């Protein structure tokens, strides 16, 4: 990669004054060689597989950050789906032991999060899947760095309503900090660097580095400096800023991969917000011209923003991966959270944004006593969109015990302040109790 002086100068300004950083360096490692018939042997094999890379990961990231003068917010690990590793064991207690062991390894080596406590159950549930699903609440409640998901739908197979219900019931048994590390998903790609969707895909090499970028403050500044620009000019300016953000992401990823001696994988183009003021995707949408995110025009502003980010990112790198859409977690974006607290942002609004490249309903609070029917039905709605439009989508809900709509619960760190949102008045939804798998949409026929 070659950079001209003006590009370097612009990126330096972004780094120094616009909160530009790299959200995550995610090392993805194949842990399937650690499959063993007993949990004790599995734990030992996991350690043997992971430690040679883990002990070098944090130092490598810090060397690259220091050398380039770039802030890297989190260092993460993604492992092969743990449900596969549970196939020969088939016990929930083993899943919990593996979860705690991975959490301990992450803490030991300065890794902020571990992804891959996951199962793909969009077409049915295997022995290992069942063990992981049973263990999910206890495993996540008893850890702090582990993340996972249940992939409950796919364009190829449709929506597994049994798995949707299981995901809803699991979430409602989780403490807030645990639910923030779990999602129900559809069509989850193999190279996602963001949590809780990260895992090591079956088509990847033994180890690979994937990058999650950030920098909404950069794009907000660009938009606010153009109050009278027409929308095409505004789109072009956002696209150019996204190009620079993505180029930085690829540079960091390649340098870390070189330090570790593993291949570089991909850059997720999603511009990730954080709870800090000046680091908000929703603020970009309001700078485009919304009085408040959630107002009429929100979908247009979001579509304009995401299209520009994708086009700028696609020009910057040929290694596009992950979700690469609009990443707008409600609690992790201070402006989104405020809009939700005011009632400007509702679940209906969030569902409508799925059509223009939002990556799901993310980090939204719900009352701790929310009815399972309502939670399952909400997940099913999102999965239906994912199947119909062939999109990768997720639902990450955070139940807050004793809370009512409008209440706020501070999770701290990157998770921010969770606003409890109204799921609606319907507690009894028979549809959410129907079993079986809804067939895939006609979109499936395009794959033939």
Swiss-Prot record:
Domain of life assignment: Archaea
| Pfam families (alphabetical) | DUF711
Q: Which residues form a coiled coil?
A: none
- Write out the transmembrane intervals: none
Q: List the disulfide bonds.
A: none
Q: Which InterPro entries match?
A: UPF0210
Question: What PANTHER family does this protein's entry cite?
Answer: UPF0210 PROTEIN MJ1665, UPF0210 PROTEIN SPR0218
Similarity comment text for this entry: Belongs to the UPF0210 family.
What name does UniProt use for this protein?
UPF0210 protein Pisl_0759
């Amino acid at each position: 990669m070659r950079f001209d002086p003006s590009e370097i100068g612009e990126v330096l300004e972004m780094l120094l004054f616009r909160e530009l950083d790299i959200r995550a360096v995610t090392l993805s490692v194949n842990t399937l060689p650690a499959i063993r018939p007993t949990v004790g042997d599995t734990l030992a094999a996991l350690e043997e597989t992971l430690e040679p890379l883990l002990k070098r990961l944090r130092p490598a990231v810090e060397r690259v950050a220091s050398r380039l003068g770039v802030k890297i917010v989190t260092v993460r690990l993604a492992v092969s789906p743990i449900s596969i590793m549970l196939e020969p064991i088939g016990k929930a207690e083993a899943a919990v032991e593996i979860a705690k062991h991975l959490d301990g390894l992450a803490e030991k080596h300065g890794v902020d999060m571990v992804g891959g406590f996951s199962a793909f159950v969009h077409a049915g549930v295997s022995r290992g899947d069942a063990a992981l699903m049973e263990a999910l609440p206890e495993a996540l409640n008893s850890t702090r760095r582990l993340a996972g998901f249940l992939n409950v739908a796919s364009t190829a197979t449709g929506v597994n309503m049994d798995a949707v219900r299981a995901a809803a019931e699991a979430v409602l048994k989780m403490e807030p900090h645990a639910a923030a590390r779990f999602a129900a998903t559809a069509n989850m790609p193999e190279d996602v660097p963001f949590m809780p969707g990260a895992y090591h895909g079956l088509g990847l090499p033994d180890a690979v580095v994937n990058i999650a970028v950030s920098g909404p403050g950069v794009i907000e500044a660009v938009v606010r400096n153009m109050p009278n620009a027409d929308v095409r000019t505004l789109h072009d300016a956002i696209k150019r800023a996204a190009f620079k953000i993505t180029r930085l992401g690829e540079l960091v990823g390649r340098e870390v991969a070189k330090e570790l001696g593993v291949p570089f994988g991909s850059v997720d183009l999603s511009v990730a917000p954080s709870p800090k003021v000046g680091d908000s995707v929703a603020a970009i949408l309001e700078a485009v011209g919304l009085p408040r995110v959630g107002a009429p025009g929100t979908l247009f502003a979001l579509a304009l923003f995401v299209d520009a980010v994708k086009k700028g990112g696609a020009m910057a790198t040929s290694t596009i991966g992950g979700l690469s859409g609009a990443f707008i977690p409600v609690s992790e974006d201070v402006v989104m959270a405020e809009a939700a607290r005011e009632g400007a942002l509702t679940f209906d609004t969030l569902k409508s944004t799925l059509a223009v490249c939002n990556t799901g309903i993310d980090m939204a609070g719900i009352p701790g006593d929310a009815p399972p029917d309502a939670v399952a039905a909400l997940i099913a709605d999102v999965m239906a969109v994912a199947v119909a439009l062939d999109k990768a989508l997720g639902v990450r809900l955070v139940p807050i015990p004793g809370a009512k709509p409008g209440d706020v619960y501070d999770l701290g760190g990157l998770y921010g302040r969770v606003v409890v949102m109204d799921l609606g008045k319907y507690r009894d939804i028979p549809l959410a109790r129907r079993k079986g798998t809804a067939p895939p949409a006609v979109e499936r026929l395009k794959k033939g």
